[in-house]
Amino acid sequence: MITTLIIIGAAFLVGPRTFKFVLAYLLGYYNAFGPPLQIVQFMVWLIIIYFPKKFFSLGWYFCHDAFSSYFGDPNGGQLPVSTKFHSLTDMID
C-alpha cells in the first residue's frame, strides 16, 4: 500500500497526464476480476478519464434522436441564440 501511494505521488509530481494514466491503471488493477477483465476495465477507465467530452458527446451523437423525440426538441439540437443584441452598446441602449 505504501508503494502504491509513493507511485501515485511520483506520478502526480511528473504531470497530470502521467497521474491520470497511473490512476486508471491502479483502478483497473485493484478490482475483483481476473487478468483478462483487468485489461478491459483499465481501457474503460482510460476512456472515461482521458476523453470525457468525446465519450459523452459520442453518446449524445448516437442518442440525440431518441432524446429529442422523447423530450421534444424545438431547436433541433442547436443552442438557442438570441439575435436581439449584436453588441454591448445595443444591449445598453
From Swiss-Prot:
Keywords: Membrane, Transmembrane, Transmembrane helix. Its main location: membrane. The keyword Transmembrane helix applies. The keyword Manganese does not apply. It is a multi-pass membrane protein. The chain crosses the membrane at residues 5-25, 32-52. It is found in: Membrane. One of its GO terms (cellular component) is membrane. This is Small hydrophobic protein. It comes from Tupaia virus (isolate Tupaia/Thailand/-/1986).
